A protein has these predicted regions:
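Chalcogenol-based redox active-site neighborhoods
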Residues: 1-144
C-alpha cells in the first residue's frame, strides 16, 4: 500500500538481491496471528536485520486494505512489510494453501515462515495443523 493506494509488488522487486524473512498467516485479525505471530516479528525486526535480513514481510490471503489496516493496528508498518496475496496465487505457487472453508474463510495460506536469499529459498518452516512454533520469529532467529 502506498499513499496513493494499492501498488502491485513483483517477485523480482521483493526478492532479487535481497535476503527476505517472510512469514504467512491464515488470516489478518485472527487470534494467534494478531496476538503472537505478527507481534513477534514486529518486536524482533531489528534482531532479524542484525542477522542479515534486508526486509521482514508478513503475507496473508487477504486484500490489500485489510493487510494495511491490520499493519496499522499492530504498529507494524514501519518494521514489517504487509503483503496481500489477494487471490492466493503466491501461496498456491508455493503449494502451501489451506482449506479453511470449515471456518467460513475459504482458501488461505498455511502458517509458515521462510527466508529467501536473492530469490532462492534458504529456510522454510511450515506449521503442522493449528500449531504455532516453527514459524515464529524466535525460531527463525535461532536458525539464522
Amino acid at each position: 500500500m502506498t499513499d496513493k493506494g494499492p501498488k502491485p509488488l513483483g517477485y523480482s522487486e521483493l526478492f532479487e538481491g535481497k535476503r527476505v524473512a517472510l512469514f504467512a498467516v491464515p488470516g489478518a485479525f485472527t487470534p494467534t496471528c494478531s496476538q503472537q505471530h505478527l507481534p513477534g516479528f514486529v518486536n524482533k525486526a531489528e534482531e532479524l536485520t542484525d542477522k542479515g535480513i534486508d526486509t521482514v514481510a508478513c503475507m496473508s490471503v487477504n486484500d490489500v486494505f485489510v493487510m494495511d489496516a491490520w499493519g496499522k493496528s499492530q504498529n507494524a508498518n514501519e518494521k514489517v512489510l504487509m503483503l496481500a496475496d489477494g487471490n492466493g496465487e503466491f501461496t498456491a505457487a508455493l503449494g502451501l494453501q489451506l482449506d479453511a472453508s470449515g471456518f467460513g474463510m475459504g482458501s488461505r495460506s498455511q502458517r509458515f515462515s521462510l527466508v529467501i536469499n536473492d530469490g532462492q529459498v534458504e529456510i522454510l518452516n511450515v506449521e503442522d495443523g493449528g500449531e504455532f512454533r516453527v514459524s515464529s520469529c524466535e525460531f527463525m532467529i535461532d536458525q539464522l
